[in-house]
Design a protein with these regions (language model features):
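Short alpha-helical elements
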Residues: 1-329
Length: 329
């Protein structure tokens, strides 16, 4: 079953409003003054729908506002100006992480999670290696088949069925181990960069990077499930540190694993490639087009939340989880 565009927007709004009322509104501070022209649920719904890249006539927040103003005034009678809409989105960016977590709580079932890093370039072509937008946080890094990129690095934990459970961002030149450290410490409620300590337990063996890292509540809920990782996370010191400090069991493939174990491990981790491919193709995670740090955090959080919601809608309709490209007709 597919959805026409109007039915999709209505379904998305109903789901978002239900989550907002139960998981977000109770945490919102009381505000005085006149009522807002658009409700938070309407703003969040449009901000999430704007991340879709398949079956929709828009490619950005500006595009969906233009579309809503021209074609869907019966669904959204009061449409904010573009600048006001952008401000509301940035102020509510944390709501996207709460939506992501609420959906993950409902959909994530199974025995293990999977973790991997993902480069997010922020500029195309020659501009990729010159300062521009996000010049204070974007850096040249290596990732994605050992290619260089100019942007930021994402570390994500994904459930075995493909549902995103948490993520962290850092400058492109920050090693993946430190981005994972930030993610795990955030999940444990003590965000920071400590790393393994020396034999006396006083000083870190390796000093943490000084580049930008987003210390924000995007890591998701703590879990006792084992996390499968690639071989780059091997090392007894780091694995023991994460287990002791944050209660996280990271399981990289052993070097001397037998062929059958390597085959199972590779198959189990295939969901990582599927997830990042869908985030890129159906939700535009690469080249997010943000001009500021908060704009980048808002868009990344919205894209991951939209991805989880897409899986939820597909399941409600009895469709394959990752059939995003054919959901809207």
């Amino acid at each position: 079953m597919e959805l026409d565009l109007e039915t999709f927007l209505v379904a998305l709004y109903v789901i978002v409003d239900d989550i907002y009322q139960s998981a977000i509104k109770p945490w919102m501070p009381a505000c005085g003054g006149p009522p807002a022209q658009m409700s938070d649920s309407e703003v969040l719904c449009l901000g999430l729908a704007a991340q879709w890249r398949s079956g929709v006539p828009w490619q950005s927040e500006r595009g969906i506002m233009r579309y809503g103003r021209k074609h869907r005034r019966h669904l959204f009678p009061t449409v904010l100006t573009q600048s006001a809409f952008n401000r509301r989105l940035r102020r509510r960016w944390g709501a996207f992480s709460l939506i992501q977590a609420a959906v993950a709580d409902q959909l994530a079932q199974g025995a293990y999670d999977v973790m991997d890093g993902f480069p997010i370039p922020v500029a195309h072509g020659a501009r990729s290696f010159n300062p521009g937008w996000l010049a204070d946080i974007a850096r040249i890094g290596q990732g994605g088949n050992d290619r260089y990129f100019y942007g930021v690095r994402m570390m994500m934990v994904i459930h075995q069925n493909g549902v995103a459970t948490g993520w962290a961002l850092a400058s492109g030149n920050v090693p993946e181990r430190w981005v994972a450290e930030l993610l795990f410490s955030t999940r444990a409620g003590v965000p920071g960069l400590q790393g393994p300590l020396d034999a006396q337990g006083h000083k870190p063996k390796v000093l943490p990077p000084e580049e930008w890292m987003a210390v924000v509540p995007s890591g998701g809920a703590a879990s006792n499930k084992p996390i499968l990782s690639d071989g780059g996370f091997r090392g007894d010191d780091g694995l023991a540190h994460w287990a002791n400090a944050y209660g996280v069991q990271v399981c990289p493939l052993p070097k001397a694993a037998p062929r059958a174990e390597r085959h199972w491990f590779s198959s189990a981790r295939q969901v990582v490639d599927t997830t990042f491919a869908n985030l890129t193709e159906s939700f535009g995670l690469k080249y997010p087009g943000a001009h500021s740090t908060w704009g980048l955090l808002t868009r990344v959080a919205a894209k991951v939340a939209a991805y989880n919601l897409g899986i939820m809608i597909n399941r409600l309709l009895g469709r394959p989880d990752f059939a995003f490209a054919t959901l809207i007709v």
